[in-house]
């Protein structure tokens, strides 16, 4: 799945209008981490992606971004 950034509180992290690939991150049973969806930002950092009907969201300390399905 691909999503397009529709809002970013910091353009150096996610660029407005840019298309990003949604990646599946598989959990590690030893660490009890479940599978999740993730996006990779402009600096190659991984963010947990919370999907919604229209796209999805990312949030962190002093940062948020919204995405729409592309």
Tell me the role of every PLM-derived stretch:
Residues 1, 65-70:
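Short intrinsically disordered terminal tails
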Residues 58-62:
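Extracellular interaction modules
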Residues 2-57:
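Basic/aromatic-rich interaction segments and small domains that mediate binding to polyanionic partners
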């Amino acid at each position: 799945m691909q999503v397009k950034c529709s809002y970013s509180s910091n353009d150096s992290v996610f660029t407005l209008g840019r298309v990003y690939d949604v990646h599946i991150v598989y959990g590690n049973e030893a660490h009890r981490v479940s599978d999740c969806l993730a996006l990779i930002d402009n600096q190659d950092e991984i963010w947990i992606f919370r999907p919604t009907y229209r796209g999805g969201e990312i949030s962190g300390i002093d940062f948020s971004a919204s995405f729409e399905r592309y």
